[in-house]
């Protein structure tokens, strides 16, 4: 709920000033005059009360001490309890994810990985949010290399083979032979075909019709007839700059 707006304290109004003094009488008709002060009193002997035995005859269901278990504002606490219970139910609705490793990866686990797993356990929330990266030391890497390749005594190294040079490598190759000998390269160097042009939306204006108004361009026969007769001035058919 939004917080309540703070009410501004009203400015204290000045006290009213009366020209006449108030009368010594009841100020309102509903009020009664003050009773005279009691002067003659009686003294009654008092008896001490034992609070432990005074409620011994009361039934337990009417015990007043049970009210202390309930808070003063029950409605507000009930709402807060309902909100907390709803939050708890929504948070515990989805269980935490658990990761299972396959048997093949578990069988080929190295001592370094096992040592990192046996370390101080962290909460599941942190583990699920981070990627699982094994921490390997240099010693564990050596053990891993010895463990993964136990049957091979030596590493196979390919022989140093040099490709023979072509006899005409130093001589220049003519352009015709180069195109015939390398057809695959010519395919890569060829320019891509341009896409086909789409439909023409608006045709270009001919150069002789530049500066002429559109109305006379559409009526070229009438325009030519009126120009021959001299009934059209330049300001009537030319576009103003």
Swiss-Prot record:
Motif (KEN box): 177-181
Biased composition (Polar residues): 100-110, 181-193
Motif stretch (D-box): 129-136
Keywords recorded for this protein, A-Z: Cell cycle, Chromosome, DNA damage, DNA repair, Nucleus, Phosphoprotein, Ubl conjugation
Basic residues: compositionally biased ranges: 1-10, 72-87
One of the record's GO molecular function terms: chromatin-protein adaptor activity
Processing and modification events after translation: Phosphorylated by PLK1, promoting interaction with polymerase theta (POLQ).
Disordered: annotated segments: 1-27, 68-134, 157-204
GO-annotated biological processes: cellular response to ionizing radiation; DNA damage checkpoint signaling; double-strand break repair via alternative nonhomologous end joining; protein localization to site of double-strand break; recombinational repair
Sequence motif: RAD1-binding motif, positions: 56-62
GO cellular component, one term: nucleus
This protein's record includes keyword Nucleus: yes
Record localization: Nucleus; Chromosome
Free-text note regarding domains: The RAD1-binding motif mediates interaction with RAD1.
Function text: Involved in microhomology-mediated end-joining (MMEJ) DNA repair by promoting recruitment of polymerase theta (POLQ) to DNA damage sites during mitosis. MMEJ is an alternative non-homologous end-joining (NHEJ) machinery that takes place during mitosis to repair double-strand breaks in DNA that originate in S-phase. Accumulates in M-phase; following phosphorylation by PLK1, interacts with POLQ, enabling its recruitment to double-strand breaks for subsequent repair.
Quaternary structure, from the entry: Interacts (when phosphorylated by PLK1) with POLQ; promoting POLQ recruitment to DNA damage sites. Interacts with RAD1; interaction is direct and promotes association with the 9-1-1 (RAD9-RAD1-HUS1) complex. Interacts with RAD18. Interacts with TOPBP1. Interacts with UBE2N.
Name of the molecule in the record: RAD9, HUS1, RAD1-interacting nuclear orphan protein 1
Species of provenance: Bos taurus
Lineage summary: Eukaryota, Metazoa, Chordata, Craniata, Vertebrata
Gene: RHNO1
């Amino acid at each position: 709920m939004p917080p309540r707006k703070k009410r501004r304290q009203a400015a204290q109004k000045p006290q009213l000033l009366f020209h006449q003094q108030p009368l010594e009488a009841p100020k309102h008709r509903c009020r009664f005059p003050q009773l005279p002060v009691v002067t003659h009193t009686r003294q009654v002997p008092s008896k001490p009360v034992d609070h432990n035995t005074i409620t011994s005859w009361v039934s337990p269901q009417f015990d007043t001490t049970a009210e202390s278990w309930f808070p003063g504002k029950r409605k507000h606490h009930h709402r807060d309890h309902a909100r907390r219970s709803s939050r708890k139910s929504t948070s515990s609705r989805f269980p935490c994810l658990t990761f299972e490793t396959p048997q093949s990866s578990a069988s080929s686990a190295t001592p370094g990985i096992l040592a990192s797993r046996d370390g101080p356990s962290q909460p599941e929330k942190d583990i699920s949010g981070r990627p699982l990266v094994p921490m390997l030391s240099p010693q564990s890497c050596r053990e891993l290399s010895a463990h993964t390749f136990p049957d091979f005594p030596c590493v196979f190294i390919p022989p140093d083979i040099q490709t023979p040079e072509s006899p005409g490598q130093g001589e220049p190759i003519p352009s015709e032979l180069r195109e015939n000998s390398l057809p695959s390269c010519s395919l890569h160097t060829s320019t891509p075909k341009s896409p086909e042009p789409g439909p023409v939306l608006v045709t270009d204006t001919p150069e002789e019709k530049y500066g002429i108004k559109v109305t006379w361009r559409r009526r070229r026969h009438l325009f030519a007839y009126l120009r021959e007769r001299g009934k059209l001035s330049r300001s009537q058919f030319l576009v103003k700059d």
